[in-house]
Design a protein with these regions (language model features):
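Amphipathic alpha-helical interaction surfaces in cytosolic regulatory modules
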Residues: 11-27, 35-50
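Short glycine-/aliphatic-rich beta-strand segments at the starts of folded cytosolic domains
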Residues: 1-7
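Short glycine-enriched loop/turn motifs at secondary-structure junctions
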Residues: 1, 31, 48-52
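N-terminal intrinsically disordered, cationic/polar leader segments
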Residues: 4, 18-24, 29, 36, ...
């Protein structure tokens, strides 16, 4: 498991972020305060405060480095 901070503060960034993550089979969570949502869920993401940085938790260690490279544009 790995945790990183991301910034997806626009509709376009959210769409691109979800499109990247849906290419992977692993489980990804977004944590904002006490809320934890599925990072592949556009509706769930829009329930968060996108003006703040959000914590992405990558549950699958196998694809971890590949996923981090794919989301490098969103990392804080």
């Amino acid at each position: 498991m790995k945790s990183v901070k991301i910034n997806i503060n626009s509709i376009d960034k959210v769409k691109k972020f979800v499109n990247v993550l849906t290419k992977y089979d692993g489980d990804f969570d977004l944590v904002s305060g006490h809320y934890v949502i599925d990072a592949k869920s556009i509706m769930g993401i829009f329930s968060l405060d996108l003006s703040e940085d959000i914590e992405l938790v990558i549950q699958d260690d196998v694809e971890q480095e590949e996923v981090l490279k794919a989301i490098k544009d969103f990392l804080v």
